[in-house]
Design a protein with these regions (language model features):
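Long extracytoplasmic/lumenal interhelical loops at the membrane interface
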Residues: 38-39, 43-45, 176, 300-367
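Hydrophobic, aromatic-rich transmembrane alpha-helices
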Residues: 12-15, 19, 58-73, 199-208, ...
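N-terminal signal-anchor transmembrane segment
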Residues: 2-72, 94-99, 407-409, 425
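Hydrophobic transmembrane alpha-helices and their immediate junctions
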Residues: 207, 211-212, 216, 244-258, ...
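A membrane-periplasm/extracellular boundary helix in multi-pass inner-membrane enzymes
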Residues: 148, 154-157, 251-308, 329-332
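Alpha-helical transmembrane segments of multi-pass inner-membrane proteins
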Residues: 136-164, 184-250
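Transmembrane alpha-helices of multi-pass inner-membrane enzymes
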Residues: 61, 199, 245, 396-410, ...
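Aromatic-anchored transmembrane helix interface
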Residues: 84-93, 103-127, 138, 143
Length: 453
Protein backbone atom coordinates (compact mmCIF):
# COMPACT_ATOMS: atom_id res chain seq x y z
CA UNK A 1 0.00 0.00 0.00
CA UNK A 2 2.86 2.37 0.88
CA UNK A 3 4.42 1.86 -2.54
CA UNK A 4 1.15 2.67 -4.24
CA UNK A 5 0.77 5.92 -2.27
CA UNK A 6 4.30 7.03 -3.12
CA UNK A 7 3.75 6.36 -6.83
CA UNK A 8 0.45 8.26 -6.79
CA UNK A 9 2.06 11.28 -5.14
CA UNK A 10 4.77 11.43 -7.79
CA UNK A 11 2.23 11.20 -10.58
CA UNK A 12 0.19 13.99 -9.02
CA UNK A 13 3.19 16.33 -8.70
CA UNK A 14 4.18 15.71 -12.31
CA UNK A 15 0.65 16.44 -13.47
CA UNK A 16 0.47 19.71 -11.53
CA UNK A 17 3.79 20.85 -12.99
CA UNK A 18 2.64 20.11 -16.53
CA UNK A 19 -0.66 21.85 -15.81
CA UNK A 20 1.11 25.08 -14.84
CA UNK A 21 3.35 24.86 -17.90
CA UNK A 22 0.38 24.29 -20.19
CA UNK A 23 -1.64 27.09 -18.60
CA UNK A 24 1.25 29.53 -19.04
CA UNK A 25 1.74 28.41 -22.64
CA UNK A 26 -1.98 28.78 -23.34
CA UNK A 27 -2.12 32.34 -21.98
CA UNK A 28 1.02 33.34 -23.90
CA UNK A 29 -0.37 31.76 -27.07
CA UNK A 30 -3.61 33.74 -26.89
CA UNK A 31 -1.69 36.97 -26.22
CA UNK A 32 0.66 36.20 -29.13
CA UNK A 33 -2.26 35.62 -31.51
CA UNK A 34 -4.00 38.83 -30.41
CA UNK A 35 -0.82 40.89 -30.77
CA UNK A 36 0.03 39.20 -34.08
CA UNK A 37 -3.36 39.90 -35.61
CA UNK A 38 -4.63 43.21 -34.31
CA UNK A 39 -1.86 45.24 -32.61
CA UNK A 40 -0.38 47.76 -35.09
CA UNK A 41 3.23 47.66 -36.25
CA UNK A 42 3.77 51.22 -35.05
CA UNK A 43 3.35 50.16 -31.40
CA UNK A 44 6.70 49.31 -29.85
CA UNK A 45 10.10 50.67 -28.89
CA UNK A 46 13.04 51.90 -30.93
CA UNK A 47 16.18 50.18 -29.62
CA UNK A 48 19.48 51.29 -31.19
CA UNK A 49 17.75 52.02 -34.49
CA UNK A 50 15.85 48.71 -34.47
CA UNK A 51 12.05 48.78 -34.12
CA UNK A 52 11.12 46.37 -31.34
CA UNK A 53 7.41 46.17 -32.14
CA UNK A 54 4.88 44.47 -29.88
CA UNK A 55 4.78 41.52 -32.29
CA UNK A 56 8.57 41.10 -32.24
CA UNK A 57 8.62 41.34 -28.45
CA UNK A 58 5.94 38.64 -28.17
CA UNK A 59 7.87 36.51 -30.66
CA UNK A 60 10.95 36.68 -28.41
CA UNK A 61 8.90 35.85 -25.30
CA UNK A 62 7.20 32.90 -27.03
CA UNK A 63 10.45 31.63 -28.52
CA UNK A 64 12.33 31.68 -25.20
CA UNK A 65 9.38 30.05 -23.44
CA UNK A 66 9.30 27.29 -26.05
CA UNK A 67 13.02 26.51 -25.82
CA UNK A 68 12.87 26.53 -21.99
CA UNK A 69 11.04 23.18 -21.92
CA UNK A 70 12.55 20.20 -23.72
CA UNK A 71 9.27 18.56 -24.74
CA UNK A 72 7.85 21.81 -26.11
CA UNK A 73 11.16 22.66 -27.80
CA UNK A 74 11.37 19.23 -29.44
CA UNK A 75 7.83 19.45 -30.80
CA UNK A 76 8.43 22.97 -32.10
CA UNK A 77 11.63 22.12 -33.99
CA UNK A 78 10.08 18.88 -35.22
CA UNK A 79 7.35 20.97 -36.87
CA UNK A 80 9.99 23.08 -38.61
CA UNK A 81 12.04 20.05 -39.75
CA UNK A 82 9.02 18.43 -41.42
CA UNK A 83 7.47 21.62 -42.80
CA UNK A 84 6.30 21.60 -46.43
CA UNK A 85 7.64 25.16 -46.78
CA UNK A 86 11.11 24.62 -45.30
CA UNK A 87 13.18 23.83 -48.47
CA UNK A 88 11.91 26.96 -50.22
CA UNK A 89 12.30 29.15 -47.14
CA UNK A 90 15.92 27.96 -46.71
CA UNK A 91 16.76 28.90 -50.31
CA UNK A 92 15.06 32.28 -49.97
CA UNK A 93 16.77 32.99 -46.64
CA UNK A 94 20.17 32.13 -48.16
CA UNK A 95 19.52 34.85 -50.74
CA UNK A 96 18.56 37.34 -48.03
CA UNK A 97 21.72 36.41 -46.12
CA UNK A 98 24.20 37.06 -48.94
CA UNK A 99 22.28 40.22 -49.87
CA UNK A 100 22.57 41.36 -46.25
CA UNK A 101 26.34 40.81 -46.30
CA UNK A 102 26.99 42.41 -49.68
CA UNK A 103 24.68 45.39 -49.09
CA UNK A 104 25.57 45.74 -45.39
CA UNK A 105 21.88 45.75 -44.48
CA UNK A 106 20.93 43.54 -41.55
CA UNK A 107 17.22 44.32 -42.00
CA UNK A 108 17.31 42.46 -45.32
CA UNK A 109 17.78 39.20 -43.44
CA UNK A 110 16.08 39.98 -40.13
CA UNK A 111 12.80 41.16 -41.63
CA UNK A 112 12.08 37.86 -43.39
CA UNK A 113 13.58 35.76 -40.59
CA UNK A 114 11.22 37.30 -38.04
CA UNK A 115 8.21 36.76 -40.30
CA UNK A 116 8.97 33.07 -40.84
CA UNK A 117 9.78 32.43 -37.16
CA UNK A 118 6.43 33.98 -36.24
CA UNK A 119 4.73 31.74 -38.81
CA UNK A 120 6.22 28.60 -37.26
CA UNK A 121 5.31 29.77 -33.76
CA UNK A 122 1.76 30.09 -35.10
CA UNK A 123 1.90 26.55 -36.50
CA UNK A 124 2.95 25.26 -33.08
CA UNK A 125 0.30 27.30 -31.25
CA UNK A 126 -2.51 26.15 -33.54
CA UNK A 127 -1.39 22.52 -33.54
CA UNK A 128 -0.44 21.91 -29.91
CA UNK A 129 -2.09 24.66 -27.86
CA UNK A 130 -5.23 26.28 -29.26
CA UNK A 131 -6.38 23.96 -32.02
CA UNK A 132 -7.91 25.09 -35.30
CA UNK A 133 -11.43 25.65 -33.93
CA UNK A 134 -10.35 27.92 -31.06
CA UNK A 135 -7.91 29.77 -33.33
CA UNK A 136 -10.67 30.58 -35.82
CA UNK A 137 -12.95 31.72 -32.99
CA UNK A 138 -10.29 34.15 -31.75
CA UNK A 139 -9.63 35.43 -35.28
CA UNK A 140 -13.34 36.08 -35.82
CA UNK A 141 -13.59 38.03 -32.56
CA UNK A 142 -10.52 40.11 -33.46
CA UNK A 143 -11.84 40.73 -36.98
CA UNK A 144 -15.19 41.80 -35.50
CA UNK A 145 -13.44 44.31 -33.20
CA UNK A 146 -11.32 45.51 -36.12
CA UNK A 147 -14.38 46.09 -38.34
CA UNK A 148 -16.35 47.90 -35.63
CA UNK A 149 -13.36 50.18 -35.15
CA UNK A 150 -13.35 50.74 -38.92
CA UNK A 151 -16.88 52.18 -38.80
CA UNK A 152 -15.98 54.43 -35.86
CA UNK A 153 -12.83 55.47 -37.71
CA UNK A 154 -14.81 56.50 -40.78
CA UNK A 155 -17.17 58.63 -38.66
CA UNK A 156 -14.46 60.41 -36.64
CA UNK A 157 -11.85 60.20 -39.47
CA UNK A 158 -9.23 58.93 -37.06
CA UNK A 159 -8.11 55.38 -36.29
CA UNK A 160 -8.40 54.51 -32.60
CA UNK A 161 -5.31 52.34 -33.07
CA UNK A 162 -3.30 55.54 -33.58
CA UNK A 163 -3.42 56.09 -29.83
CA UNK A 164 -0.90 53.21 -29.71
CA UNK A 165 1.58 55.01 -31.97
CA UNK A 166 4.95 54.97 -30.24
CA UNK A 167 7.02 54.55 -33.42
CA UNK A 168 6.28 57.81 -35.32
CA UNK A 169 6.41 58.36 -39.06
CA UNK A 170 4.89 55.04 -40.11
CA UNK A 171 1.23 56.04 -40.60
CA UNK A 172 0.06 57.18 -44.03
CA UNK A 173 -3.38 58.83 -43.78
CA UNK A 174 -5.20 58.72 -47.11
CA UNK A 175 -7.86 61.05 -48.54
CA UNK A 176 -9.17 60.24 -52.02
CA UNK A 177 -11.67 62.43 -53.89
CA UNK A 178 -12.48 64.19 -50.62
CA UNK A 179 -13.28 60.96 -48.71
CA UNK A 180 -11.32 59.60 -45.76
CA UNK A 181 -10.01 56.05 -46.31
CA UNK A 182 -9.98 53.85 -43.21
CA UNK A 183 -6.85 51.87 -42.38
CA UNK A 184 -7.70 49.97 -39.17
CA UNK A 185 -4.57 48.76 -37.34
CA UNK A 186 -2.45 49.12 -40.50
CA UNK A 187 -0.30 52.02 -41.64
CA UNK A 188 -2.15 52.46 -44.95
CA UNK A 189 -5.69 52.02 -46.28
CA UNK A 190 -4.47 49.61 -48.98
CA UNK A 191 -2.81 47.46 -46.32
CA UNK A 192 -6.10 47.19 -44.44
CA UNK A 193 -7.76 46.05 -47.67
CA UNK A 194 -5.18 43.24 -47.90
CA UNK A 195 -5.94 42.17 -44.32
CA UNK A 196 -9.68 42.03 -44.99
CA UNK A 197 -9.58 40.04 -48.24
CA UNK A 198 -7.11 37.50 -46.81
CA UNK A 199 -9.12 36.99 -43.60
CA UNK A 200 -12.63 37.09 -45.08
CA UNK A 201 -12.80 33.47 -46.37
CA UNK A 202 -12.07 32.17 -42.85
CA UNK A 203 -15.36 33.56 -41.52
CA UNK A 204 -17.23 31.54 -44.15
CA UNK A 205 -15.99 28.15 -42.92
CA UNK A 206 -18.47 25.68 -41.44
CA UNK A 207 -16.13 23.42 -39.46
CA UNK A 208 -18.87 20.95 -38.55
CA UNK A 209 -19.84 20.28 -42.17
CA UNK A 210 -16.33 20.97 -43.55
CA UNK A 211 -17.92 23.30 -46.08
CA UNK A 212 -18.07 26.95 -47.13
CA UNK A 213 -21.11 29.03 -46.26
CA UNK A 214 -21.17 32.75 -47.01
CA UNK A 215 -23.82 33.23 -44.32
CA UNK A 216 -21.93 31.40 -41.59
CA UNK A 217 -21.38 34.80 -39.92
CA UNK A 218 -23.87 37.20 -41.51
CA UNK A 219 -23.09 40.23 -39.34
CA UNK A 220 -19.33 39.83 -39.70
CA UNK A 221 -19.73 39.32 -43.46
CA UNK A 222 -21.57 42.64 -43.76
CA UNK A 223 -19.04 44.40 -41.52
CA UNK A 224 -16.11 43.14 -43.60
CA UNK A 225 -17.85 44.22 -46.81
CA UNK A 226 -18.55 47.69 -45.39
CA UNK A 227 -14.95 48.08 -44.24
CA UNK A 228 -13.64 47.09 -47.68
CA UNK A 229 -15.78 49.84 -49.21
CA UNK A 230 -14.44 52.35 -46.72
CA UNK A 231 -10.79 51.53 -47.46
CA UNK A 232 -11.30 53.05 -50.90
CA UNK A 233 -9.25 50.23 -52.45
CA UNK A 234 -10.58 49.35 -55.91
CA UNK A 235 -8.49 46.20 -56.21
CA UNK A 236 -9.58 44.94 -52.76
CA UNK A 237 -13.25 45.49 -53.63
CA UNK A 238 -12.93 43.75 -57.01
CA UNK A 239 -11.14 40.76 -55.46
CA UNK A 240 -13.67 40.62 -52.61
CA UNK A 241 -16.50 40.35 -55.16
CA UNK A 242 -14.63 37.49 -56.88
CA UNK A 243 -14.18 35.74 -53.52
CA UNK A 244 -17.90 36.05 -52.77
CA UNK A 245 -18.83 34.59 -56.18
CA UNK A 246 -16.48 31.61 -55.78
CA UNK A 247 -17.72 30.90 -52.26
CA UNK A 248 -21.32 30.90 -53.51
CA UNK A 249 -20.44 28.61 -56.44
CA UNK A 250 -18.65 26.13 -54.17
CA UNK A 251 -21.34 26.09 -51.48
CA UNK A 252 -23.73 23.15 -51.30
CA UNK A 253 -27.16 23.46 -52.91
CA UNK A 254 -29.06 24.32 -49.73
CA UNK A 255 -26.63 27.06 -48.66
CA UNK A 256 -26.42 28.36 -52.22
CA UNK A 257 -30.17 28.93 -52.37
CA UNK A 258 -30.26 30.67 -48.97
CA UNK A 259 -27.25 32.81 -49.89
CA UNK A 260 -28.72 33.98 -53.20
CA UNK A 261 -32.01 34.94 -51.53
CA UNK A 262 -30.18 36.76 -48.73
CA UNK A 263 -27.88 38.63 -51.14
CA UNK A 264 -30.79 39.61 -53.38
CA UNK A 265 -32.69 41.10 -50.43
CA UNK A 266 -29.54 42.71 -49.04
CA UNK A 267 -28.57 44.26 -52.38
CA UNK A 268 -32.12 45.51 -52.98
CA UNK A 269 -32.21 47.21 -49.58
CA UNK A 270 -28.68 48.58 -50.11
CA UNK A 271 -29.54 50.05 -53.53
CA UNK A 272 -32.65 51.71 -52.11
CA UNK A 273 -30.63 53.09 -49.18
CA UNK A 274 -27.79 54.38 -51.37
CA UNK A 275 -30.18 56.05 -53.82
CA UNK A 276 -32.33 57.38 -50.98
CA UNK A 277 -29.28 59.06 -49.44
CA UNK A 278 -27.68 59.79 -52.82
CA UNK A 279 -26.05 63.08 -51.82
CA UNK A 280 -24.40 61.79 -48.64
CA UNK A 281 -20.66 61.18 -48.45
CA UNK A 282 -21.11 57.46 -47.80
CA UNK A 283 -23.40 56.88 -50.81
CA UNK A 284 -21.04 58.78 -53.07
CA UNK A 285 -18.14 56.66 -51.78
CA UNK A 286 -19.97 53.40 -52.52
CA UNK A 287 -21.03 54.50 -56.01
CA UNK A 288 -17.56 55.86 -56.75
CA UNK A 289 -15.99 52.52 -55.81
CA UNK A 290 -18.16 50.52 -58.21
CA UNK A 291 -17.83 53.14 -60.94
CA UNK A 292 -14.02 53.12 -60.62
CA UNK A 293 -13.91 49.35 -61.11
CA UNK A 294 -16.25 49.63 -64.11
CA UNK A 295 -14.09 52.40 -65.59
CA UNK A 296 -10.93 50.33 -65.11
CA UNK A 297 -12.47 47.37 -66.93
CA UNK A 298 -14.19 49.18 -69.79
CA UNK A 299 -12.24 52.44 -70.16
CA UNK A 300 -15.22 54.67 -69.27
CA UNK A 301 -15.36 57.68 -66.93
CA UNK A 302 -18.43 57.05 -64.79
CA UNK A 303 -16.52 57.62 -61.54
CA UNK A 304 -16.21 61.35 -62.25
CA UNK A 305 -19.98 61.68 -61.73
CA UNK A 306 -19.47 60.67 -58.10
CA UNK A 307 -16.55 62.97 -57.32
CA UNK A 308 -13.62 60.83 -58.46
CA UNK A 309 -10.40 62.51 -59.54
CA UNK A 310 -10.26 60.82 -62.93
CA UNK A 311 -6.86 62.22 -63.87
CA UNK A 312 -5.36 60.88 -60.65
CA UNK A 313 -6.91 57.43 -61.16
CA UNK A 314 -5.66 57.37 -64.75
CA UNK A 315 -2.16 58.34 -63.65
CA UNK A 316 -2.25 55.59 -61.01
CA UNK A 317 -3.11 52.95 -63.64
CA UNK A 318 -0.48 54.25 -66.09
CA UNK A 319 2.11 54.32 -63.31
CA UNK A 320 1.51 50.65 -62.46
CA UNK A 321 1.81 49.66 -66.11
CA UNK A 322 5.35 51.06 -66.14
CA UNK A 323 6.54 49.06 -63.13
CA UNK A 324 7.24 45.73 -64.94
CA UNK A 325 9.72 47.64 -67.13
CA UNK A 326 11.98 47.81 -64.07
CA UNK A 327 12.98 44.22 -64.88
CA UNK A 328 14.67 45.57 -68.02
CA UNK A 329 16.75 48.23 -66.24
CA UNK A 330 20.38 47.32 -67.00
CA UNK A 331 21.78 49.23 -64.01
CA UNK A 332 20.07 46.84 -61.59
CA UNK A 333 22.17 43.78 -60.75
CA UNK A 334 20.03 40.72 -61.68
CA UNK A 335 21.86 38.50 -59.15
CA UNK A 336 22.34 40.81 -56.17
CA UNK A 337 19.40 42.82 -54.89
CA UNK A 338 19.54 46.23 -53.22
CA UNK A 339 18.20 45.02 -49.85
CA UNK A 340 15.19 46.39 -47.99
CA UNK A 341 16.60 49.63 -46.56
CA UNK A 342 17.84 51.40 -49.69
CA UNK A 343 15.68 54.02 -51.35
CA UNK A 344 14.80 53.29 -54.99
CA UNK A 345 14.06 55.70 -57.82
CA UNK A 346 14.27 55.45 -61.60
CA UNK A 347 13.11 57.34 -64.67
CA UNK A 348 11.15 55.15 -67.09
CA UNK A 349 9.52 56.55 -70.24
CA UNK A 350 9.79 60.04 -68.78
CA UNK A 351 8.12 59.13 -65.47
CA UNK A 352 10.00 59.21 -62.17
CA UNK A 353 9.33 55.93 -60.38
CA UNK A 354 9.73 56.16 -56.59
CA UNK A 355 6.91 54.11 -55.10
CA UNK A 356 6.89 50.44 -56.16
CA UNK A 357 3.20 49.51 -56.22
CA UNK A 358 3.86 45.91 -57.22
CA UNK A 359 5.12 43.38 -54.68
CA UNK A 360 6.83 41.14 -57.23
CA UNK A 361 8.71 44.02 -58.82
CA UNK A 362 9.68 45.17 -55.33
CA UNK A 363 10.97 41.67 -54.51
CA UNK A 364 13.16 41.80 -57.62
CA UNK A 365 14.60 45.16 -56.53
CA UNK A 366 15.20 43.88 -52.98
CA UNK A 367 16.53 40.38 -53.73
CA UNK A 368 17.14 40.27 -57.52
CA UNK A 369 16.14 37.22 -59.59
CA UNK A 370 17.41 34.56 -57.12
CA UNK A 371 15.23 35.93 -54.31
CA UNK A 372 12.22 36.55 -56.52
CA UNK A 373 12.37 33.05 -58.04
CA UNK A 374 12.84 31.39 -54.63
CA UNK A 375 9.86 33.27 -53.21
CA UNK A 376 7.62 32.58 -56.22
CA UNK A 377 8.51 28.86 -55.97
CA UNK A 378 7.37 28.96 -52.33
CA UNK A 379 4.06 30.44 -53.46
CA UNK A 380 3.60 27.92 -56.28
CA UNK A 381 4.42 25.02 -53.96
CA UNK A 382 1.88 26.27 -51.42
CA UNK A 383 -0.80 26.81 -54.06
CA UNK A 384 -0.29 23.34 -55.57
CA UNK A 385 -0.34 21.69 -52.13
CA UNK A 386 -3.60 23.46 -51.28
CA UNK A 387 -5.23 22.41 -54.55
CA UNK A 388 -4.12 18.80 -54.09
CA UNK A 389 -5.40 18.59 -50.50
CA UNK A 390 -8.79 20.27 -50.79
CA UNK A 391 -10.55 16.97 -50.01
CA UNK A 392 -8.98 16.76 -46.53
CA UNK A 393 -11.18 19.57 -45.23
CA UNK A 394 -12.93 21.20 -48.15
CA UNK A 395 -14.25 24.28 -46.36
CA UNK A 396 -11.11 25.22 -44.45
CA UNK A 397 -8.60 24.38 -47.19
CA UNK A 398 -10.63 26.34 -49.75
CA UNK A 399 -10.80 29.29 -47.34
CA UNK A 400 -6.99 29.22 -46.99
CA UNK A 401 -6.66 28.84 -50.76
CA UNK A 402 -8.98 31.77 -51.56
CA UNK A 403 -7.38 34.02 -48.96
CA UNK A 404 -3.88 33.07 -50.12
CA UNK A 405 -4.56 33.51 -53.84
CA UNK A 406 -6.58 36.72 -53.38
CA UNK A 407 -3.85 38.27 -51.26
CA UNK A 408 -1.05 37.65 -53.76
CA UNK A 409 -3.26 38.58 -56.71
CA UNK A 410 -3.80 41.95 -55.05
CA UNK A 411 -0.04 42.33 -54.59
CA UNK A 412 0.29 42.80 -58.34
CA UNK A 413 -1.18 46.26 -57.68
CA UNK A 414 0.70 47.18 -54.49
CA UNK A 415 3.52 46.22 -52.14
CA UNK A 416 2.87 44.09 -49.05
CA UNK A 417 2.87 47.10 -46.69
CA UNK A 418 3.81 45.00 -43.64
CA UNK A 419 0.85 42.62 -44.06
CA UNK A 420 2.64 39.39 -45.04
CA UNK A 421 1.95 38.02 -41.57
CA UNK A 422 -1.75 37.66 -42.43
CA UNK A 423 -1.12 35.39 -45.41
CA UNK A 424 1.52 33.49 -43.41
CA UNK A 425 -1.24 32.84 -40.86
CA UNK A 426 -3.22 31.09 -43.62
CA UNK A 427 -0.13 29.06 -44.49
CA UNK A 428 0.24 28.13 -40.81
CA UNK A 429 -3.37 26.93 -40.63
CA UNK A 430 -2.91 24.87 -43.79
CA UNK A 431 0.29 23.32 -42.41
CA UNK A 432 -1.63 22.23 -39.30
CA UNK A 433 -4.38 20.72 -41.47
CA UNK A 434 -1.77 18.57 -43.24
CA UNK A 435 -0.09 17.57 -39.97
CA UNK A 436 -3.41 16.52 -38.42
CA UNK A 437 -4.37 14.61 -41.56
CA UNK A 438 -1.04 12.74 -41.61
CA UNK A 439 -1.45 11.91 -37.93
CA UNK A 440 -4.93 10.49 -38.60
CA UNK A 441 -3.64 8.49 -41.57
CA UNK A 442 -0.78 7.06 -39.47
CA UNK A 443 -3.22 6.05 -36.71
CA UNK A 444 -5.46 4.26 -39.19
CA UNK A 445 -2.45 2.49 -40.68
CA UNK A 446 -1.33 1.28 -37.23
CA UNK A 447 -4.81 -0.03 -36.44
CA UNK A 448 -4.97 -1.75 -39.80
CA UNK A 449 -1.55 -3.39 -39.27
CA UNK A 450 -2.57 -4.66 -35.83
CA UNK A 451 -5.77 -6.07 -37.24
CA UNK A 452 -3.92 -7.94 -40.01
CA UNK A 453 -1.44 -9.26 -37.51
Amino acid sequence: MEQVRTYTAKRKSSYIKNSYENKGLYVLSVIFLVVYYIVPQYFGLSVAGFDLTAQRLMMLIMFFYIISFNDIKNRFFDIIRHSIYLPYIIVFMCVTMYTMVLRVDINTFMQSAIEFICMYILVYIIKDVLGIKRTLQIIKVLLFIMCLQGIVEYVIQFSLFQYLETLPGKINIQIRSGSYRIMGPCNHALAYGLVLISSFPLICVDLEKKALNLLQNKILFMLVMLNIFLTGSRSALAIFIIEVLFIIILSDRENKKKTIIFLFCFLLISVIAVLGFYNTSFSQTVLRQFASIFDELFGTQWAVKFGAEVERLSQSSSYRELLPKIFKQSWLNPLIGRGVSRHFSAVIDGYTIMSIDNFFVAQYIRYAYPGLIAYVLLLINTLVKMLKNVKINKGLVLACLFGFFSYYMNLWFMDALQTLKYVYMLMAIFEVILIENNKTADTKQIKKSKYIK
